[in-house]
Structures are given as C-alpha cells and as structure tokens.
C-alpha cells in the first residue's frame, strides 16, 4: 500500500490521535491565522478541524452562534462591514496592517459602519481620474515629440517650386496660396521652403564669389621682372633696340677695324 506524504493527511492524522482539550485552539493550521477571539470576540475553541478527509474550516467565516446555537443571520455581511472596502485596503495595505482591530471593539452593523467611515476619512484616497497610465511598450510612441516633422516633397512639387523660385525669389501671399493649392501643400510649407531656398541661394552665392576672387588673385597680375604692361610690350622692345652702345664696346670695334700699313 503506497504511503501518503500529503501535509493535510499527516496533520489530520496527528489531530485525530491526540485530541486537544476543550477550550484550546486546534494544534496546527495550514497557514498562520490569528486567533479568532482577537478579531470577533469568540472563544478560543469556537473553530475546530473537521474529520479526516475534509477541508479545514476558516476561523473567520464561522461564528460561535452557528456552531453552538440556533441558526441566525449569516456573518458574512458583518465580516464585510468590519473591514474597509477592497479598494482602500488594496491601496493602503501597510496602513491596514498597522491599524488592526483591537479585541475590545464593539460589534454590530452601526459600529462597523462608523469604523469604516472613520477609516475612509482618516486615509482619503486620491481621485483615480488624476492619473494617466501609459503602457511601457508604447511609451516612446505616445510621448509628444519636440522636433517638427520634415515634409517629404515629391519630384513634381520640387520641380514646380524650383521653377517658381527661379522666376521670383519672394512671393506674395496670394501667389503663395495659389502655389500651395496647385501643389496640394499648405501655405506654411510653401513659405518655409522658400525661406530655406533663399538661405541656400545666399550660401551658394557667397561660395562662388569667394572661389572667383581667389582664382583671380592667383592667375592675374604682371610678372615682377617686367616694368611695363602687356599693352606696351611692343614699345618696350622698340626702346631696347634703340639703346646706345657702351664706350668699351665701341672702342673695341674701332680697334678691330683699323688697318695696318
């Protein structure tokens, strides 16, 4: 016969072998439960374990009148009224543990309702409409972006805008509205495009002027060895041909030309 290792069977077997004296709580509980008389003013022996093979009875759900007296009204409404609502107990669990019900508190519907009202006034709950919950997965998508979205122009729109810019760099408001309506754009988009295009045009103009000035400075200018410009180069050559000969060269030529007798 296989041996059973269930905790309930072992606990119930020990409870049946060793009967507890009357007026004492049961020997063991499946979970740590405070004595029932501390919450409802019942005697310690009010709750007891049933026979083997049955589940244990919760000590908070059975009253002394149901066990040892005539049937009366159910204790579940009293149990619900003795504690604060579920929402407040869920939100203030640590506070609920600290302020437990004392053994000497009077029981009854009026006392329980007064205790619940006092608890709610002592610990007011915030308005749940003030909170805005955002899921973790979609937090990056739902947050507002500070950057402005760039407009993706089509090739046809860019061609028409460039053509209009070549004819007129500054548009009037009426012309801007006409272009925006024709290209299926907003007036603000057309205005921003023309502003950016003018800035780009100015940058391109400054760059071309700078490159042109640097090329003229490097390639232009007359050579330092020549004292005359290119326009008077012919005059300079004529002046060089008419320069007088030096005295030494003239005397040498005279000596060579003398004839001996």
Curated annotation (Swiss-Prot):
Subcellular location: Nucleus
GO cellular component terms listed in the entry, alphabetical order: nucleus
Annotated spans, SNAG domain: 1-20
Amino acid composition bias (Gly residues), ranges on this chain: 210-223
GO MF terms, alphabetically ordered: DNA-binding transcription activator activity, RNA polymerase II-specific; RNA polymerase II cis-regulatory region sequence-specific DNA binding; sequence-specific DNA binding
InterPro entries reported for this sequence: GSH1/2, HD, HD_metazoa, Homeobox_CS, Homeodomain-like_sf
Biased amino acid composition, Low complexity: 226-235
Any GO BP: adenohypophysis development
Pfam families assigned to the protein according to its UniProt record, in alphabetical order: Homeodomain
Alphabetized SUPFAM superfamilies for the sequence: Homeodomain-like (SSF46689)
Record has Nucleus as a keyword: yes
Main localisation: nucleus
Disordered: region residues: 201-261
Basic and acidic residues composition-biased segments: 251-261
DNA-binding region: 146-205
Its biological purpose: Probable transcription factor that binds to the DNA sequence 5'-GC[TA][AC]ATTA[GA]-3'. Activates the transcription of the GHRH gene. Plays an important role in pituitary development.
PANTHER family: GS HOMEOBOX 1, GS HOMEOBOX 2
Family: Belongs to the Antp homeobox family.
Protein name stated in the entry: GS homeobox 1
Encoding gene, per UniProt annotation: Gsx1
